Amino acid sequence: MSSSRPTQCSSSSSRTRQSSRARILAQTTLDAELNAEYEEYGDSFDYSKLVEAQRTTGPEQQARSEKVIAYLHHIQRAKLIQPFGCLLALDEKTFNVIALSENAPEMLTTVSHAVPSVDDPPKLRIGTNVWSLFTDPGATALQKALGFADVSLLNPILVQCKTSGKPFYAIVHRATGCLVVDFEPVKPTEFPATAAGALQSYKLAAKAISKIQSLPGGSMEVLCNTVVKELFDLTGYDRVMAYKFHEDDHGEVFAEITKPGLEPYLGLHYPATDIPQAARFLFMKNKVRMICDCRARSIKIIEDESLHLDISLCGSTLRAPHSCHLQYMENMNSIASLVMAVVVNENEDDDEVGADQPAQQQKRKKLWGLLVCHHESPRYVPFPLRYACEFLAQVFAVHVNKEFELERQVREKSILRMQTMLSDMLLRESSPLSIVSGTPNIMDLVKCDGAALLYGGKVWRLQNAPTESQIRDIAFWLSDVHRDSTGLSTDSLHDAGYPGAAALGDMICGMAVAKINSKDILFWFRSHTAAEIRWGGAKHDPSDKDDSRRMHPRLSFKAFLEVVKMKSLPWNDYEMDAIHSLQLILRGTLNDDIKPTRAASLDNQVGDLKLDGLAELQAVTSEMVRLMETATVPILAVDSNGLVNGWNQKVAELTGLRVDEAIGRHILTVVEESSVPVVQRMLYLALQGKEEKEVKFEVKTHGSKRDDGPVILVVNACASRDLHDHVVGVCFVAQDMTVHKLVMDKFTRVEGDYKAIIHNPSPLIPPIFGADEFGWCSEWNAAMTKLTGWHRDEVINKMLLGEVFDSTNASCLVKNKDAFVSLCILINSALAGDETEKAPFSFFDRNGKYIECLLSVNRKVNADGVITGVFCFIQVPSHELQHALHVQQASQQNALTKLKAYSYMRHAINNPLSGMLYSRKALKNTGLNEEQMKEVNVADSCHRQLNKILSDLDQDSVMNKSSCLDLEMVEFVLQDVFVAAVSQVLITCQGKGIRVSCNLPERYMKQTVYGDGVRLQQILSDFLFVSVKFSPVGGSVEISCSLTKNSIGENLHLIDLELRIKHQGKGVPADLLSQMYEDDNKEQSDEGMSLAVSRNLLRLMNGDVRHMREAGMSTFILSVELASAPAK
């Protein structure tokens, strides 16, 4: 499917959503066609032939709206269920039965001989009231669940039949116009059982969840292999797989584990039609699907004749599978299956949701894939274990989201780095030939098998590219058919309508194009998808003839290969964005129309940035100092040596150590011995720029506080940075946890008196809530009411997870589903007896205010040591701390804005520089005389210097002594360096009437040396500029040099070059000189920064700089080490 990219293109996520909708619509139509064919032909149904027809049948021919509607109705409202349970549909107002499965009367009302009864057993039919069928307390629990807005909250509900005494799991969900209840028999070994909703299922999956939580991250393969292994152990199925859906909706077995002896499916790819779009929609609604026995006869549903619509079974766990799917399972000897949906966030860079936005505005979701369990014999998994598997899949989905984000960051960084390198190559050569003939080249920008450049009527080919004549033919086709587009991407040249696609063969299927102009074009090529795919399954014997009518994984793989026979992997949006960016750079580089207004606009932006940035920085700095001094939370700071240089009044008050006594002490002398390793590690990481959060350590007390014991602090480390982003110290913003620990200790020691502590109105008591072992909210103190706005009687005896806290419909809404899953893990871990760490927690209060805090969950134990629930403590940062954090975030945002501005400036400067380079090259070809050519060469040298400085913006810190600024080892002539450096100050000299004289022996100037001439030119020009600036009007600047050779071989010498720049006047101010020698000076001026960078460069070149003053004169003495060229 081809897509051309217009010059003004929409956002990546918008394009993705549009293409996704079109693809789903087309795929659903094809699913309906296949279903109609299957229903019509039965055993004669030829799956392989019909799937292949997808490639040759256009969407207009496929459009059969009646078939699609009938197909979707059949999938969602088929009147069949599986026989392992029964089903009732109830009227929402009367709770009378309006539909039931044929086996319901037998399962729910058959009289058991073991249960004597004097009453007539109730008859189950249309109109029967459901409360007449079950005994208390099950009936009461069911009635309570049906009264909830989310009726599925308490699933499963344990009920017992009045007539037979048989126990059942009642699983409730809401359908259009009714309530649907699935009933599944409970095994005798499980009865009596506690059925308290989701909390009890967690214990079954606790080990698997802990394993996934402990993974280091950075590998999707490891994550998938781990989850299938844990599901294999948890469920006992013969085969467990992780299916991954690709961008074109085809599937892949991405991870697998089997019992010994089974044929592996790992690596198998299957067409999108294997899992229809309607089935994928149902997985989004009902995330767990179980088929107990594909050979069992389905049970019919009997409905009230007065119903206008058939009952929807979308949410039913009993819904019968489609006969086509049952046949597929039978053919692959998979008699039973259990499938969990993996639902993740869509990648929408332009639709980011802020932290303070309600949950209803969260990101769109998509089906990433499925976790699939197969068994070779009938197998039933009870609901609690199924729910545990669903919860495990949710945890897995959270980690998949994290892997996506990590992959996106790595990918973007790689593409930006490659774009920068290609852009630098273009700047040096001012011709696109450099990015196809050099290393790296355009093939390194995006994944491809070949590439080509059509430029100036000539063709350059890389690796698997079409022949020159074929490329010219493609270019002609583009100019004829896609004349108005600036580019094109397609995964199939055949489907895009290129007439020569057949001649290209399988090796060239996909293509991406970027037009530089109407005649010059960049091409990227991809081979067919099948070349990328190798199934690791059992090899096929060529002598065996497959039955194309027998649906089986091998046939799916064969059908998939037919579908993608003339297709490549699709071009992702981020790849096309990278190509488009390179296209813009090329257009700017080759554009000889220099626009002066661009430079003027850039100057204005630079000026505005400097003014705004300085004002913001001053405001932030003064505000931070004020906050630290007056904050009601403990704040302390140390320098890079660990010596205390900040100790606010709150710390002094808590520890008894006065500010003047603390300043200058080493941080390790003021903390308890047991906390020394923790603080050492925290300090070390912070000085490396890695800021730890929520670290607990103890501080010694002094004076009158000595007998109170150590102060317990929970600390966030914030690296203090100077103007050049160097870490010069660490600030510790803390929460005093001493009172909290006393409260916790009292909880541990005191039995029966905890309520007096919880409901104490003292402001020292933090917000506390709790739940019993079944998940019902059992505690909610006054501080919690004040924090949330919800009173105790409004939340007590509600489900803590689902009614009190949830991501969609609860008293306190959490940010999103991922946050809710994390809360579930935290509370369930405590209920399971695990130790839990303090964790960040956030939610919206009653008025929609976003609350950010820390949550500590602790198990509640009775006198016998049995866990009876959990207590949850909330720590809310003080207003001062919150404000300090907001100020810090503002500072970080300001720094980010500057970085983006630098990136923009670097990119924007490149284009006019390219135009200037083009003009100079054009001048060289106009027959200039020797003097004129010298002037052009000086301009070239200055251009290279500026380009080198721009490339420094990619360095983490140009001021860092240990940073690796690039130094080249190239051949150059000293005279060229001196002439170019002096030319940069001549305009300033003319304005001040300053004379520049060069006392440079000609034998030195003509010397050919090895080193970094551009960096030496940069150093010399910086020191010349400062010398001129601080020379009086009408003064003079003199440059001299001396050179010493030291032989290190027959033809090789080391050269010690000493340069002296002498100027009249009072000389350079002492403050500016100190800035040159002190890299960490917080008040460094532009000139000071320039001199400091130049000094660092000199030191990298085994040199340095000195400054001398004498009567009416000042001198910079620069030393640098070079190498001489071999004797010729």
Curated annotation (Swiss-Prot):
Post-translational modification here is noted as: Contains one covalently linked phytochromobilin chromophore.
Q: Which UniProt keywords apply?
A: Chromophore, Photoreceptor protein, Receptor, Repeat, Sensory transduction, Transcription, Transcription regulation
Domain PAS: residue ranges: 620-690, 750-834
- Annotated ranges, domain GAF: 219-404
Instruction: Kindly give the Gene3D superfamilies that the UniProt entry links to this protein.
Output: 3.30.450.270, 3.30.450.40, Histidine kinase-like ATPase, C-terminal domain (3.30.565.10), PAS domain (3.30.450.20)
Q: Source organism's superkingdom?
A: Eukaryota
Which molecular-function annotations from GO does this UniProt entry contain?
phosphorelay sensor kinase activity; photoreceptor activity; protein homodimerization activity
Q: Which Pfam families match?
A: GAF, HATPase_c, HisKA, PAS, PAS_2, PHY
Task: Respond yes or no to whether keyword Transcription is given for this record.
Answer: yes
Using the record's annotation, list all stretches that form the Histidine kinase domain.
Answer: 904-1124
> Might you name a Gene Ontology BP term for this protein?
red, far-red light phototransduction
* InterPro entries, per the entry: GAF (IPR003018), GAF-like_dom_sf (IPR029016), HATPase_C_sf (IPR036890), His_kinase_dom (IPR005467), HisK_dim/P_dom (IPR003661), PAS (IPR000014), PAS-like_dom_sf (IPR035965), PAS_2 (IPR013654)
Family to which this protein belongs: Belongs to the phytochrome family.
| Subunit composition and interactions | Homodimer.
Which protein, by its recorded name, is this? Phytochrome A
The organism is Oryza sativa subsp. japonica
Q: Which gene encodes it?
A: PHYA
